Amino acid sequence: MANTASARKRIRQNERRRERNVARMSRMRTFIKKVELAIQAGDKSAAAEAFKVAQPEMQRAAGKGVIAKNTISRKLSRLSARVKALATA
């Protein structure tokens, strides 16, 4: 239990930040799912468009510190490769 005013304030701040981070992470996952669904459906243009929309959202999450930058780079690279493979197939 927090005894000082500053500790209580930190608890409030942490809770607000956690809620924000959860929302950002959820939003990012939703965009990724849209890309993956388009890839599974075999829809080249929809996959490319969904990826185009998902990319800045994922980078924004990394910029805000919700997820590590290297993790986002890896995920973007793999998604991009899958979209590209779909376009050439």
UniProtKB/Swiss-Prot annotation:
Name of protein: Small ribosomal subunit protein bS20
Cellular component terms (Gene Ontology): small ribosomal subunit
Species per Swiss-Prot/TrEMBL record: Gluconobacter oxydans (strain 621H)
Biased composition (Basic and acidic residues): 12-22
Gene name of this polypeptide: rpsT
A Pfam family annotated for this UniProt entry: Ribosomal_S20p
Region of interest (Disordered), ranges: 1-22
Family classification: Belongs to the bacterial ribosomal protein bS20 family.
Role played: Binds directly to 16S ribosomal RNA.
One annotated GO molecular function: small ribosomal subunit rRNA binding
Keywords noted in UniProt: Ribonucleoprotein, Ribosomal protein, RNA-binding, rRNA-binding
Presence of keyword Lyase: no
GO biological process, one term: translation
Recorded superkingdom: Bacteria
